[in-house]
Regions:
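Extracellular carbohydrate-recognition regions
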Residues: 208-276
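A short beta-strand micro-motif common to beta-rich folds, especially ectodomain repeats
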Residues: 62-64, 72-84, 180-191
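Extended, low-complexity, turn-rich repeat/linker tracts enriched in Gly/Pro/Ser/Thr and Asp/Glu
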Residues: 134-136, 310, 325-328, 337-345, ...
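Terminal, low-complexity interaction segments
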Residues: 358-430
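Solvent-exposed, low-complexity, repeat-rich "mucin-like" stalks and linkers
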Residues: 2-34, 102-141, 224, 228
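Surface-exposed binding patches on compact interaction domains or structured appendages
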Residues: 24-63, 136-162, 167
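Surface-exposed, low-complexity/disordered Ser/Thr/Gly/Pro/Asn-rich loops and linkers
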Residues: 257-326
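Extended extracellular/luminal ectodomain segments enriched in beta-structured repeat modules
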Residues: 314, 323-333, 397-399
């Protein structure tokens, strides 16, 4: 008496799978040991046949079906008997099926999907993600709002009508009458009166568009001219220049293979390369950018290093000088990734342009404090995750620039702790 599986795993939803039996004679299936009877002991496990007569050259198929699970992960065991053998076990496991509110990979428990534009009808919505719904859930959603004059979030009753994963979507209606930051705070109460607080999310009402409605970003950088390095996030090998002499760097250089997890190994981009080969720096789309402890990867940038930096320099990048319209707030979006030991968070904001940051008593010099905020790096490894931050207008400032840096929470005295993270697709809008 042979079976092709010793264990079977099922998702939380009602689902079926098969195993095969090869036997020399009569066989039986039970749901209790030392018995050839099916007693429906578990109630949620079903088989499409309980017995059969086999021959050594024939594989007989049995289908196992598990009902939808609405509780914790559960397990069962079924037993095969016959042909001189008893209690030949097959273990069955089914995933947890309890309804969950499921945050986005960036840690937000809800988001603002769509754009809010000044003097235009709102077409955006708040999305609250969930998984493992039965399709019978009902919630009262309450939204409180700061800013966003003219826009209203539709607090009220919401029903989930389809089983599985999805979103509760709260429409935003009205016409925004003022550019600037808008913050939404969301709570939901179920039919039993239990309340869930989803925290708050901020975005901006945007005004930066031309006469045709096309957006006018203050800044973009996608590192699309970075050709070299192993792909740390995609876990793929790559190439880098065979000649790593800084003065000889050229996009026409011959290349050699490098493994995944290895950057281009040509030195710091905004330090060594910028100072040693200005023409190559322009060729890779970095003119006007400064910073420290950052490195080339294929199509994106690495911040930080594998070892502590005793000079107190965090991995960072500083944009060219920005032309920020007076009085307008901004929204920064970019992608982050991690693959090994990484800082706990990144730090962003507006600073006065300089060639790099130097730590002084645990802070970074020349930052406009009112613009500084943090983005979490508590994210899945090997995955690009979009993060965002609202940046209040910095007011009158000489040479305002955007900075993205390893956060000051990663400093230890005058040392920046070891840790690497990766940045791509930077965009700043207003």
């Amino acid at each position: 008496l042979k079976r092709n599986l010793r264990e079977m795993s099922f998702p939380y939803v009602e689902s079926s799978d098969t195993f095969t039996i090869r036997a020399t004679g009569d066989w039986y299936i039970s749901d209790a040991p030392d018995s050839r009877e099916w007693t429906n002991a578990y109630g949620w496990v079903h088989v499409d046949r309980l017995s059969g007569k086999g021959d050594p050259g024939t594989y007989q198929k049995v289908t196992v079906t598990c009902d939808q699970n609405t509780s914790e992960e559960r397990s069962a065991t079924i037993y095969l008997h016959g042909c001189g053998e008893e209690n030949v076990a097959i273990a069955i496991r089914q995933d947890n099926g309890i309804f969950e509110w499921k945050p986005f990979d960036n840690g937000q428990q809800f988001d603002v999907s769509g754009m809010l534009k000044l003097n235009a009808e709102a077409g955006a919505k708040l999305r609250i993600p969930y998984i493992k719904a039965l399709g019978t859930e009902k919630y009262t959603v309450t939204v409180t709002q700061t800013g966003g004059d003219g826009i209203t979030a539709a607090s009220g009753s919401y029903s989930i009508s389809t089983a599985g994963n999805g979103y509760i979507e709260v429409p935003l209606t009205g016409t925004a009458t003022k550019q600037g930051i808008v913050t939404f705070a969301v709570k939901a109460t179920d039919e039993a009166g239990a309340e869930k607080d989803f925290g708050s999310v901020s975005t901006i009402v945007r005004a930066g568009f031309d006469a045709q409605g096309e957006e006018l970003p203050l800044l973009t950088q996608n590192f699309g001219k970075f050709p070299w390095g192993g792909d740390c996030i995609g876990q793929k090998a790559g190439v880098t220049t065979a000649d790593k002499t800084v003065a000889n760097l050229s996009l026409d250089n011959e290349t050699v293979s490098v493994s995944a997890g290895t950057n281009a190994s040509i030195g710091g981009i905004t330090s060594t390369v910028r100072n040693g080969n200005p023409s190559f720096y322009r060729a890779i789309g970095m003119e006007g950018w400064t910073g420290y402890l950052n490195y080339m990867c294929p199509g994106y940038m690495q911040f930080g290093a594998a070892g502590d930096n005793a000079d107190g320099q965090p991995g960072n990048i500083i944009s060219p000088v920005l032309n920020i319209p007076a009085g307008y707030d901004m929204l920064l979006t970019f992608k982050v990734g991690i693959w090994a030991a990484a800082p706990d968070q990144g730090m962003v904001g507006i600073c006065e342009k300089n060639d790099g940051f130097w730590i002084s008593k645990g802070t970074l010099s020349k930052i406009v404090a009112s613009t500084k905020s943090y983005v979490s790096l508590d994210i899945p490894a090997y995955t690009w995750v979009e993060v965002s931050a609202v940046i209040p207008n910095p007011g009158s400032l000489a040479n305002p620039s955007l900075f993205i840096s390893t956060a000051d929470s990663w400093f230890s005295g005058s040392t920046v702790k070891a840790g690497r993270w990766y940045v791509d697709d930077i965009k700043l809008v207003y």
